[in-house]
């Protein structure tokens, strides 16, 4: 039967589904330039969400075509190694073969239960090289200043033109040259072998466009990112020259929306990014350019590789125990694993379905650098020996429907992964006075920037925010988030009688979406000193009118600027 079984036809239909997905992905991505040129910011947000949702839509369509096109023998899992072999032959000459493997995995998982997953039937381990050789000449552009940096910059912007003119290119190039000379060692700008290498395609995200590359000599290199802004009615402005690796890393952060960029050979571009950002895992780099499912595949491979090669064992994550989620981690792997508890604390009114919807919402909204990206997994299987006994006991106690022991294996039926950060409340306990001020200032900015993106965190307690390795404050607990425009911000009405103020119950009605910002200070800060400092830094967050003005701007269609980098000398 094996030779008669239609392995080749099944493989072909799976790949046809992938081609359909890739074509629609390209169409959405290719529209980014026009949206930037025409300042279509709301359309850009919709396109970003549509591209994220596209993957699951096309997987579902391909699954249906398979079920309609083949009889029940399609679900004979023992035959799927033949499909995998036929599929490998079909993708061997493709430029996006690693993405095609992930697509195959998605189709397999849509047809079979996760306990049937094996490397014989799908691509648990890739058959492709993890990184490719240097990008081809067509993928990058090279400029050699030979001591004449201003001429090289002029040549760059002769090549990177748009259908909208630059607002004042001579002014911007002069400022750009000054920033480069200030940020690089003096000798580098005089080195006759200095080269500026830029990726040929422009990267687009939200209201910005980005030239991405590096400055290098035979001995050293620096990343280079040049953000461009479209100042409506004026033209395009060259906004900055960024050469600091930490700052460039933040631009490609797990807290950002995904870039739109025309990439003919994804592995080559990721390899290019990896050379300028060696600290980034390729999972994060694939995700940053919209291939989040392949980023998930690379993350999983890194995880099973870590478990196989170390003595690391799962422990409960540091911090206050959550009322909805239970969080565990591996000390040597920079990730937390979040599961939904079977029973929530009485203070929580959400249910499991709502929590799942909230976490999935985060995937499709603009995270403005202030919400951690998540990956959702089903049926993780780990060796029981990889759990500290106290950790496993707690997980089994709070989530017995999600965490199950099967012999020597622990099955985690459903979880999310997020980048591990230091909880803000723990960070403040050991921070210096200057660090406390900086962290609280960034905490307030995080709340304001989320609000500008039409996101209200709901539960804004310090424990629900984390501090990244770059010192940025990021929100990561999503069970109460909602759109800002759904909230009814109110002032507390004056008491009717003196005894009203002494009552344990409010003397006014409170609706389910009512929020009283005046109540924030004691709710957010038990520490009086921190409460006073935050009032100095961001006291307007305690004013209902501040929030209402933001709501008005959002309802009017205004897309507010949130920059993923320090603006050094913006033009007003």
Swiss-Prot record:
Reaction(s) catalyzed by this protein? L-seryl-[isocitrate dehydrogenase] + ATP = O-phospho-L-seryl-[isocitrate dehydrogenase] + ADP + H(+)
State the protein's name: Isocitrate dehydrogenase kinase/phosphatase
Q: Tell me which family the UniProt entry assigns to this protein.
A: Belongs to the AceK family.
What organism does the UniProt record list as the source?
Ectopseudomonas mendocina (strain ymp)
Q: Which GO terms describe its molecular function?
A: [isocitrate dehydrogenase (NADP+)] kinase activity; AMP binding; ATP binding; phosphoprotein phosphatase activity; protein serine/threonine kinase activity
Taxonomic superkingdom? Bacteria
Any one Pfam family here would be AceK_kinase
Binding positions for ATP per the UniProt entry: 317-323, 338
Q: Which UniProt keywords apply?
A: ATP-binding, Cytoplasm, Glyoxylate bypass, Hydrolase, Kinase, Nucleotide-binding, Protein phosphatase, Serine/threonine-protein kinase, Transferase, Tricarboxylic acid cycle
Q: What's the EC number here?
A: 2.7.11.5, 3.1.3.-
Please give the GO cellular component terms listed in this UniProt entry: cytoplasm
Q: Which cysteines are joined by disulfide bonds?
A: none
InterPro entries reported for this sequence: AceK_kinase (IPR046855), AceK_regulatory (IPR046854), Isocitrate_DH_AceK (IPR010452)
């Amino acid at each position: 039967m094996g030779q008669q079984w239609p392995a080749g036809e099944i493989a072909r239909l799976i790949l046809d589904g992938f081609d359909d997905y890739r074509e629609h992905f390209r169409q959405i991505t290719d529209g980014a330039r026009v949206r930037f040129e025409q300042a279509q910011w709301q359309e850009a947000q919709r396109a970003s969400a549509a591209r994220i949702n596209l993957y699951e839509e096309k997987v579902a369509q391909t699954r249906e075509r398979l079920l309609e096109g083949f009889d029940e023998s399609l679900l004979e899992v023992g035959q799927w190694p033949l499909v995998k072999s036929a599929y490998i032959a079909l993708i061997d000459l493709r430029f996006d073969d690693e993405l095609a493997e992930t697509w195959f995995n998605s189709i397999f998982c849509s047809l079979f239960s996760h306990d049937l997953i094996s490397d014989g039937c799908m691509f648990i381990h890739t058959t492709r090289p993890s990184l490719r050789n240097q990008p081809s000449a067509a993928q990058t552009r090279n400029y050699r200043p030979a001591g004449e940096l201003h001429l090289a910059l002029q040549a760059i912007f002769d090549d990177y033109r748009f259908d909208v003119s630059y607002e004042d290119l001579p002014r911007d190039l002069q400022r750009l040259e000054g920033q480069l000379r200030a940020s690089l060692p003096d000798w580098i700008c005089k080195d006759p072998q200095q080269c500026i290498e830029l990726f040929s395609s422009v990267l687009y995200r939200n209201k910005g466009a980005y030239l991405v590359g590096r400055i290098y000599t035979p001995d050293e290199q620096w990343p280079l990112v040049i953000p461009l802004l479209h100042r409506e009615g004026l033209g395009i402005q060259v906004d900055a020259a960024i050469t600091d690796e930490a700052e460039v890393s933040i631009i490609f952060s797990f807290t950002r929306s995904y870039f739109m960029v025309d990439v003919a050979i994804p592995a080559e571009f990721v390899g290019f990014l990896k050379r300028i950002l060696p600290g980034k895992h390729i999972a994060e780099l694939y995700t940053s350019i919209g291939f989040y499912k392949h980023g998930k595949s690379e993350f999983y491979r890194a995880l099973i590789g870590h478990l196989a090669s170390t003595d690391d064992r799962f422990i409960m994550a540091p911090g206050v125990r959550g009322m909805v989620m239970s969080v565990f981690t591996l000390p040597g792997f920079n990730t937390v694993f979040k599961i939904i508890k079977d029973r929530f604390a009485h203070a929580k009114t959400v249910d499991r379905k709502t929590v799942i919807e909230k976490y999935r919402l985060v995937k499709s909204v603009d995270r403005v650098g202030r919400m951690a990206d998540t990956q959702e997994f089903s049926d993780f299987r780990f060796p029981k020996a990889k759990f500290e006994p106290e950790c496993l006991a707690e997980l089994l106690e709070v989530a017995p429907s999600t965490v199950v022991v099967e012999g020597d294996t622990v099955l985690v039926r459903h979880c999310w992964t997020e980048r591990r950060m230091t909880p803000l409340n723990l960070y403040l306990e050991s921070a210096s006075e200057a660090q406390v001020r900086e962290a609280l200032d960034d905490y307030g900015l995080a709340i304001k920037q989320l609000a500008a993106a039409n996101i209200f965190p709901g539960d804004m307690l310090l424990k629900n925010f984390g501090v990244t390795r770059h010192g940025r404050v990021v929100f990561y607990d999503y069970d109460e988030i909602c759109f800002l425009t759904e909230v009814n911000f109110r002032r507390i009405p004056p008491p009717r009688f003196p005894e009203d103020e002494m009552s344990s119950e409010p003397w006014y009605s409170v609706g389910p979406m009512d929020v009283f910002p005046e109540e924030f200070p004691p709710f957010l800060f038990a520490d009086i000193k921190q409460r006073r400092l935050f009032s100095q830094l961001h006291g307007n967050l305690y004013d209902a009118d501040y929030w209402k003005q933001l709501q008005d701007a959002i309802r009017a269609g205004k897309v507010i600027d949130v920059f993923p980098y320090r603006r050094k000398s913006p033009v007003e």
